[in-house]
Amino acid sequence: MSMKFLTGLQDLLGLYETGTAASSPASPIPPTSPSMFATPPHQQSHSSATSVRKKVCQEANSSADDPDSDARIRQCSHTRTVSFPADIGLITGYHDAPSALFHSIENSNRSIDPTEILKYYREACQRRQCAPSVGVEKQIGYFHKSPDTRQELLSLKGERVSHAQMEALEEIFKRVQFNTIDFEYTFLDDDCAISLGEMIEFYDSCVRLNLSFNKQIDVRGWAAMFKSIRNAISLQMLNLRYTNLNDRSIPSLCKLARAQPSASLTCIHLENTQMSGKNLLVLICALKYNTGIRELYLGDNGLQPTDGSHIYQLISSNTCLQLLDLRNNNIGDSGVRHICEGLRNRESIEKSALSAMVLWNNNVTGASMDSLAEALMENTKIETLNIGSNNLGVEGVARLKPALVSNSHLHRLGLQNTGINCEGAIILAECIADNTALLRVDIRDNPIALAGLLALHSAMKMNTSITLLNIDATCVRMSSEKVREYQDEFERYFREIQTYCDRNKDDVLKKLTVTFEDQDHVSEDTEKENKDADNDDKEPENEDGDTTPETSDSDASADQSDSPADKEKSEKSKKENNNNEKRPLMASASTSKVCQKERHQRFVRSSSLTCAETVHDIHDRLREMSGSTHSLDAAMSAATTLSPTMLTATYGSTPGPLDASSNTDSMKTIKKTFTVTSAAPPTLALAEWGSLPALPQASPTSTPVVRKLRRFSVSPSSSVFDVATTSSASTSPIPEVTASPHPIRPSTLAIGIPVTGSVPAGPSSAPMIFVDHHTEAASPDCTNTCEEPTTSREAERKRAEETIRQRRGQKEIKDTCRAVINDLLNYVEYEEKSQVERKASLLLRNAFSRPNPEELLKNLQRAESPLTPRTPVTPSRVLEIAEELEEETDEQVCQSVVRCLVRDVLQTEKNELRSTLDRRRRHNSVRNSPV
């Protein structure tokens, strides 16, 4: 090493001994041969660069064999130079990076041939030794021929797709693009997921991808899939319902959410993916600053009240999320309060874009509605709110009333199955009467009777904005025979509600028509001015300020198609492309205007407020998916012992039968759940229809929520007046007229003289009363079934029970009379009286004085008669009045007398209602007047 260093230093400084340099000859370069540079066979390279280098070395070595090379080298070796041939001689060829056919220029010149695609698909299946899918072959035959328009759907739902079949589908993906690719319930594994992700990324195959009900995809498959989705430029919707997202695969999803710039993904479904607790917190931390996702579905994940704080962080931090779906969880009142705090946060009020929220079936009560009302009054961006399937009751509607009265931005309100009765319907009617923002209200599956229907009917007369009011048709059904003549009248009220909705809808459409006509005239004028001025192809602007690039192209195509030759060409192209439903190349100005009108009219089409499950065979799917239904099978074995017509829907409580008519509503809702006892092993979770994996075991401190599998989607649906036919409450059979201690349900709204020996059958919401009079004890020989008390102790016990029953009956009579009077007030207040009824009431007012209700109660208690059921709405004086008034029927006279009893109270309530409405109108006029 030192010798080499010294030699190099000597060469650098040029220190040579003259005598030595002149006398001592330098060592000659030893002759070399090609064998010296030869490499072993296993190290030989066949590249062109290596062969060139060998050739240069051989030429240099051959020169050393010449006689001149024996001369002494008297200079430093650093003066040598090495040269290489030109670079262009080293490059023998090149190959472009592969690209999909859809990104090339030749794509617009080609046409789609379904026969050719089918041939290539079958050949690919034959090479991979797998059977082609019959459904795929049938769908290929319906492909249209336009290369610039995506096909609508490619569905393999319910088929078992292997890795070989997935690879064979590439022959389709490389030639055709789709709007939706559906791999729901196809038993995909990691290899299938990796191949599918690569094809979606490379070919940009779809806009919406459905991978739900695939439990066999694990960490490796999800990592590759999420990486491909991050690079997909057109994918907008991803459905991952009932998939196996665990702690190891969620970080890959979080990388997708944190990607900057954000991916094209705007909607993601994560129902029943164990997204609660720590997993939810990790996901929300990734979504805080995401600017792409607009819709997030987190239903059926067993969210607890403590998860409400995580939702608070999402609402207060994210600025682009528009829809948050939290259906079928156990958030509770405390969790709702956390969410309301997020809605009231200053940053969310200023920057948040959240406009729709779903809290369906979250064990929420009326106690948290005051917080929700305050949040709605402060946050003016919420347009859709669904709080159905929660036990809100009248208290919840009353607490929500301030927000509904003063709210001017809430468009859709879902109150389905919230325990609203007639009183709650009257409160809601007061809110609807003056509200000008609501477009749809859903109050189905609530025990609303005739009084609530009349209140809603009166409110809809005044309302000018609601285009769809969902209410059960059972509210007009009356079980009593004596009021059967009023059935047609109440059905007319029910139909008029639909008429009022159609009236409001027509008014909105007329306004839209006028707006579009004005806009069309303005756009035509601007086009003429632009053409006359400088022949500029500048598009007119629409109402929203967005330009319509289709206008100039469509006008040009319309002008070019005026000649006969162009018409013939267009007809030929139509015949050739008869399978093409969408033809953007042949669009005209009229079609662009129609599309523009449809886009603007979407706000008329209200969103669906019914959380109905659309998967009818969900149980079979859960049972087939391996490793996911161990507890569900146990639940099914326990449920099969029950009657086929009796389904239970409770957790930890006594199971009760579901109404058989509950499955006959218009949305085909599946209301099926199972009862799992708390004695199950700790390793098995609770199983139910609507969630998998199921909720954790119930603890003494927290009670799991009862969940009916009813799904919610705010996707646009038809605005036709939809009236469900489900019965809100099952009516109990009326007992026979016997001297039994069971209570009798009166007909509170059945006004008429009852037939002797009959009991009016009232609605199930009416209270139970006793008409019990003090009579002598029955004789011992009255019936053979009665047994005499054998001991004095039994006799004393029976007497004590009889005394308690009598006291209880007297109290129930008083409460029932008050309830009857309240029902009569509501009935008479909203009823349109005929001339005959008014005439009878005037005659009775002049002839008789109004009796005191307290005296009627006392007389009813003092009267001694056999134990016979009566209705308190039929006083004994009605018979005398009916005999004196020969011109009127007995039923009309009875109705008039009852109305006379409550006329003073009615007048007071009408005055109060009139003053309240006048005050509100004055307040609105002052508020709306210009300052």
From Swiss-Prot:
Residues 534-547 have a biased composition (Acidic residues). The keyword Repeat applies. Residues 554-563 have a biased composition (Low complexity). Residues 519-533, 564-584, 790-807 have a biased composition (Basic and acidic residues). The keyword Repeat applies. Belongs to the PPP1R37 family. PANTHER family: LEUCINE-RICH REPEAT, ISOFORM F-RELATED, PROTEIN PHOSPHATASE 1 REGULATORY SUBUNIT 37. This is Protein phosphatase 1 regulatory subunit 37 homolog. It comes from Caenorhabditis briggsae.
